[in-house]
């Protein structure tokens, strides 16, 4: 039985050696995987930096475009305000024209008889002026004949009746 103890020691040493070899193989495999992960992370880090740069550039462009659009909107707002002011002015003008037209129509309808009388009197005044002109012209001619106002009125009446 003395021999069992050294054999057990040898078996234990061989088992320990196999265990160590197994652990070394696993550690080598893990190291390869970690190296692969490290390379992948380096690539991802480079891509993230590129994406970050592009995103920053895009944000700057968007900010510039936003400022440009805001400036144009501000300028356009002044144009819209001016057009609104013109529209308000035109609307006020239309209201004023409507009020004046209504006032004129109302005054004409109220003063229709007076206007008719004015027209009649103006016709009478024009007839008198024509008669005076005719009388003046006849006095200046060689066939001077003295007429009275009654003769002129009679002549005017006869000329209208004959027409």
From Swiss-Prot:
The chain crosses the membrane at residues 7-27. It is found in: Cell membrane. It is a single-pass membrane protein. InterPro entries: UPF0478. One of its GO terms (cellular component) is plasma membrane. The keyword Secreted does not apply. It comes from the Bacteria. Keywords: Cell membrane, Membrane, Transmembrane, Transmembrane helix. Belongs to the UPF0478 family. Its main location: membrane. This is UPF0478 protein SERP1299.
